[in-house]
């Protein structure tokens, strides 16, 4: 095997081995929002920017139509910034199985009606067998309760559970 073939094969292997990350809409929102006066939110915004610049190039990052739906809401100028930030991210498909799984999560995780799309984000990441689901939603997605219950539910369904984490928890891949 020539050196060029080895190098090509190594690069192909590296590409194939990149971790996959589903970015829930809070990631895009924190990335593009004007700096907050709230110290915790401002820190999350800064961590998100660092993650976007340093880690995102090392992973295969995805969003879904649900993310596009959420980032398109609200103030038109802010929504446009979010849409622009997400425009080059691959969008995972949605199908009936994902919708059914989202409904199951919605009920079993006791997610409030106003946060129904949080169950959809979980279902997309699970169905597509994504490695990490990245979010700043620490109530209905990245919470100890949800992590535990989701693993239990998915074990009974024979489904792989992604690692649910914040950008701060995924600074290295």
Regions inferred by a protein language model and the residue ranges of each:
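Short, well-structured N-terminal submotif of metal-dependent ribonuclease cores
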Residues: 1-63, 70-81, 89, 107-113, ...
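Active-site neighborhoods of divalent-metal-dependent phosphate/nucleic-acid chemistry enzymes
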Residues: 2-3, 89-147, 171
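Short secondary-structure boundary segments
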Residues: 25, 65, 136-138
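A short helix-to-beta-strand connector/capping loop
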Residues: 57, 87-89, 158-162
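Residues at the C-termini of beta-strands that transition into short coil/loop
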Residues: 65, 95, 167-168
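C-terminal end-helix/capping segment
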Residues: 142-163
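Short, C-terminally biased terminal segments at protein or domain edges
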Residues: 159-173
